[in-house]
Amino acid sequence: MAFNQRKRRRPVGIADFDEANDEAYESVGFHDYADYFSRKQRKLQNQNAALYKSIDEDSKSDLFHGLAIAINGYTKPSYTELRQMIVSNGGTFIQYVDGKTSISYLVCSFLTPSKARQWKHQKVVKPEWIVDCIKQKKILPWINYRTFQASSAQATLSFVASKPSQPEGNLEDIQTSSQEEEHDNEKDKTKESKAKGFLDDLSGLSASSLHNYQLLKNPNVRNSTTQNQDFLENFFSSSRLHHLSTWKADFKNEIQAMTTASEPVRPIMKDKSKKSRFLLHVDFDCFFASVSTRFSHELRLKPVAVAHGIKNSEIASCNYEARKFGIKNGMYVGTAKNLCPSLRVVDYDFGAYESVSREFYTILVNTLHDYIKVISIDEALLDITSSVSSFQDCFEIAESIRSQVREKTNCEVSVGIGPNVLLARLALRKAKPHNVYSLSIENVFDVLSPLSVQDLPGVGSSQAQKLFNLYGVRTIGQLQRIEKFNLQETFGVNYGLHLYNISRGIDTDIINNETPRRSISVDVNWGVRFVFQEDGIDFLKRLLHELLSRMGKCQVLLHQIQLRILKRADGAPFSPPKYLGAGEVTSFTKSSTFTSATNSFDLIWKKVTSMYKTINVDPGDVRGIGLQALKIIKDNSKIRKDYRSIQSITSRNKVSLKGASVDISSKDKEIISQKKQLSPKLIPSTPYDLPSSSQISSSALAQLPPSMQSDIQQQLRLQKRSITEYPSQLDPLFMVELPTPIRNEVNDNHEIAMNKRLSLKSHADNKIDERGKKKIRQENAFDKLLQISKKSKTINKPNVDYLTLKELPKDLQKQILKESNLQKSDLISEVKLEKPHIVTFQHVQSLEDLRGLLTKWYSKASKGPNIHDVNYFANYVCRVIREEKNLGKAQMMLKWLYQLNRKECNKPWEKAIDKIIETVQGECLQRNIPPLMIF
């Protein structure tokens, strides 16, 4: 593309050139590029004039007279044919575009998103406009031939035509229209500066990009791909996997919130007689198909599949009638209809799926249980060990669940009962469809022996083939005859032990409260079709906005961002079997870490674009893009906002004691009452050593600053009380709004507070006599107070509650102190925070006694600890970190337990210790504490 710096008249395209006397053919000065391109364009117009002269008079017309037209990219009719049409009808054909205002019309079949934004205010038409104008012999409205539609953000007006169109062939009207359009272009030329040229060179594109270029020329295809600005919204609204993952995360959070508040503290079980656990594995039968046909008795008896209905769409779910014909989930609709021509394909009904799933989990939550594990929207595991004593009790609960689900949703579920997760899962297979089945340790060998090894969890096709090649093993019964040593030697210590255990029905997986989510991701692997590199950049930006939107809903920040690219595999076809699908691909992954947690678009975008360019995949070969936020933490900005709101309430209701007291309004009293209930930790502190009220002179008190007078008066009133008033219960509406870690901490501290008497802090040496009354040392206390007042003329005492301040993260403490104009020295001299609460374990708190207790526990449980004991001890160590703030004590306990098992190498204990360490390290990570060094 060329830019001419000289002002010159726009060529009109008619034969008005005198080639012999034209200065365009004279020599060009050295390095005078502007003059060179000016002469070059003049020569091209001479060629157009020569072409115009060579055309028969009968084929000429002045239809495009006064219009300058350029062509961009591939067109149909071709570039040469369109040029001849324009020139023969009196138009000026522009081969090199100086700027947007140098032409009247741009003819093209396709524009990239960035070029479309550049030319959105210009007349960009399809090639058909040229052809139809010549056919009808008049200039047609260009708006009907736009290459791209107007932006959805721009409001448009609709007008009803009030006059009939003029008859064809009215030359006067045509010329008037042309002159008006020319006049408009001249106006635009004065308003806009010359823009950068854009004509795309398709010769540099790869074969895959050219294929996508041809594919995207179809507007229906283009609107179904990432080229559509609304693609993400449409994609996620109709994506089955997106709905499943979103609902699963929501159900996990909701169930965790409901169970955490009511979960009892589990003591170490001293009664070892009850060794067996009872688990229920509950699952819908053909969930999507059952929900879609639950109100149609006719469809229930016919083969039905749920899919989008397109031939190359995958079946999400099919009922048992369809499975009789060999149809399976994941099969293409076309293949399924070949097996069963009478197959009925129904579309997705995501609203019904969510409604039924919520009814399902409501029933499970209302069932007596210890824990619930959300597997998917239609499948869950329940631990009901504490609620039953035999398998017969489990059968009754399972049948109750089935009947309630049938009544509420008109769908069927199957239930598997077992002493561990593995056996409950295998029992569920036996129970399907529409039944209940139990599997105990006593009959495990009879049930497992005939099954294939691939029926075991964690055994894939490659491991099964390896077992067959080395040991001739096909069934679980054959696997049971292989020694543990041989399996560990072949597959490694851990996986070999896993194979040995699960073949005998031994499973150490446990069900407990769900851990907080560690990542948030956005993935798209359908409809991804790019032509140019900037297409991928544009879509990547939209994808990042979607990721940040999801992070905002979860109120989290990220420490690490990961980019995933799916590239068309070498030799794979450009068009996969699934319409606009990914097909056979190769995956590329790259991550980048931030020094501090962030949700800044600019910071993350800089990392993402750098990673995208580093991977360097041809844009035409990209078949999928994903972004994942890793190492996410809660955003403390909401906590800061809540704290400021409480602080503002305190400042509004502070009472000044200048001669007269001020009554607090009833509305303010209500606010203060609510504040006491919402913040049980906000206990007033006593920052001064005060004598009794009778020994304080009112004249001396008047010499102090007003803010200090108010604090002293308030403290004197509080000295009359022996016990601080404390709310007996927490507001459940407030607790639900808190993040899970903070809610747990508030519950723990509230329980501690209700089990002991809270007394006011004092910075003097307090002594309590037999009657329980405090004696405050009064020597020189008030003199010291006056000395403090003289050193600082005015102490602006901020409205900060230091017990609350102590519980906040360090960075948030600094921010609040800065905003309150409180120096670090003032905090040290005026306030002493209370000592951390010492947490006991089995009435023991010293490290020496704890070591003895752990040694006794390890020696008695030689076959491995009880899982409830493990959870209880892990929770205790977390409380040491959370309440005592004693990382050294927590570290020494974990090291001692690790050393106890180091010599014995007891595998059950090894797994239990790993579980404890994982829980404790998670607590550290949640509190932004570096991991403890155990090994």
Swiss-Prot record:
Enzyme Commission (EC) number: 2.7.7.-
Major subcellular site: nucleus
Binding site for Mg(2+) 1: 283, 378-379
Basic and acidic residues bias: start-end ranges: 184-193
The keyword GTP-binding belongs to this UniProt entry's keyword annotation: no
Disulfide-bond pairs as recorded: none
Pfam families given in the database record: BRCT_2, IMS, IMS_C, IMS_HHH_1, REV1_C
Residues holding dCTP: 240, 283-287, 317-323, 329, 378
Keyword Amino-acid biosynthesis: no
Highest taxon in the source lineage: Eukaryota
Start and end residues of each stretch annotated as Interaction with target DNA: 235-245, 310-312, 460-463, 517-525
Cofactor requirement: Mg(2+)
Binding site for Mg(2+) 2: 283-284
Domain spans labelled BRCT: 59-147
Compositional bias of kind Polar residues: 162-178
Residue numbers marked as site, Interaction with target DNA: 578, 589, 591
Functional description taken from the UniProt entry: Deoxycytidyl transferase involved in DNA repair. Transfers a dCMP residue from dCTP to the 3'-end of a DNA primer in a template-dependent reaction. May assist in the first step in the bypass of abasic lesions by the insertion of a nucleotide opposite the lesion. Required for normal induction of mutations by physical and chemical agents. Involved in mitochondrial DNA mutagenesis.
Protein name: DNA repair protein rev1
Organism encoding this protein: Schizosaccharomyces pombe (strain 972 / ATCC 24843) (Fission yeast)
The gene coding this protein: rev1
